[in-house]
Regions:
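Basic/polar N-terminal segments that are highly enriched at the extreme N-terminus
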Residues: 1-3, 121-122
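An amphipathic, aromatic/His-enriched active-site/gating alpha helix that lines ligand/cofactor pockets
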Residues: 2, 25-42, 59-69, 73-113
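Active-site-flanking beta-strand signature of metal-NTP-handling nucleotidyl enzymes
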Residues: 7-14, 71
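Short, surface-exposed ligand-recognition loops at beta-strand->loop->(often short) alpha-helix junctions
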Residues: 16-23
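Feature marks short, surface-exposed loop/turn motifs that line or immediately flank catalytic pockets
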Residues: 17, 48, 78-80
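A cross-kingdom feature marking solvent-exposed beta-strand/loop segments within repeated
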Residues: 48-61
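Specificity-determining recognition surfaces
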Residues: 116-119
Length: 122
């Protein structure tokens, strides 16, 4: 029986900060592709300076992260929808263009993905 739980994925990119406009173009392409194939894209988030006076809530436990990391997050309604997207996006011309952009510009140097589930409210 297929799992009907939503599939939420967070992707963290290590950016080449000299190629931000190329990365933004890449990001816009993937937002469109995710939504074309039935997902909800929650956006790409680029690094920025911390607000003045922003302190770590738990000194000794936390620290500010690196300034070259971008984050994206998207959700598909269920695993079947996610698998269908993965199959269909393989042949999308825009995916091929986005892959070529990354190869040509090296707008990011690595990425990692996390599959997540929400904490239910009490």
């Amino acid at each position: 029986m297929a799992n009907s739980k939503a599939v939420t994925c967070q992707i963290r990119y290590t950016l080449n900060l000299n190629k931000l406009s190329a990365f933004e173009s890449y990001a816009r392409t993937w937002m469109m592709l995710i939504e074309r194939y039935g997902g909800t894209h929650h956006g790409y988030f680029l690094p920025r300076a911390a607000p003045d006076g922003a302190e770590i809530s738990f000194p000794g436990l936390g620290n500010d992260g690196p300034g070259d990391v971008a984050v994206a997050m998207f959700t598909f309604p269920d695993e079947q929808s996610y698998r269908r997207y993965r199959q269909m996006v393989k042949t999308a011309p825009e995916r091929q263009s986005a892959a070529a952009l990354v190869r040509e510009t090296r707008c990011f140097t690595r990425y990692e993905r996390l599959f997540l589930k929400p904490v239910q409210r009490a």
